[in-house]
């Protein structure tokens, strides 16, 4: 997806017109952000998704290649590439509206085939930016290969019991967790400037003490970096993810704000 971001001191009320301070375009989308962060963190990363045959789609393809994300399984659709309209307030908090576009055109059989083909598959991450049935099919195929599945339930929608059952990890933020209700799952709760908490074990890692200027994509940076270190243990992965997310909020944008591996390692 493409991020279309407006920075403004205060979000206007209904019917009010306000003057913003800055407008930017950048590469985004939750799955794309997570893939890019995982690649930055050193993981061999493949992206399964769909873009439009348009300028945004071409830019996304090139960005993945520049970032070291394998695009063999990136499909192309007649529908426009998905976009996210983002408003960022002076305190760094954001509001986001996504228009999925080509995201809704991912072919299920092609996605499952990709899961079967990817060599040395360890982890598959899914979100709710695509049809839930596609994510479920991919998770079933992943678990059949012995891979770990991670679900980031955003943008939030009610999850099927079957998808929950096929998710080894569910990583919601506070509002998504509240909407999930009482479910039987392995949950890692991201709590913004408070850090992250593994509800099942009680383990908690505090967030870095920083001044946030833009929280866009911070949760995605946590998910991608956490996944990249999960084979080293949950404690290591949680700490690494918190550092990546903490550094990202000190810069504007989503992927453009992501720290290098060396920057994260300085704190870990």
Predicted regions and their residues:
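Beta-strand->loop->alpha-helix junctions that form or flank phosphate-binding loops
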Residues: 22, 48-53, 72-81, 154, ...
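Aromatic/hydrophobic pocket-lining residues that form π-stacking "cages" and hydrophobic walls in ligand
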Residues: 34, 60, 137-140, 244
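Ribokinase/PfkB-type carbohydrate-kinase core domain
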Residues: 62-76, 86-204
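Conserved phosphate-binding/catalytic region of the ribokinase-like
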Residues: 180-268
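Glycine-rich phosphate/adenosyl-contacting loop at the front of the ribokinase-like
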Residues: 1-50, 55-59, 212-213, 252
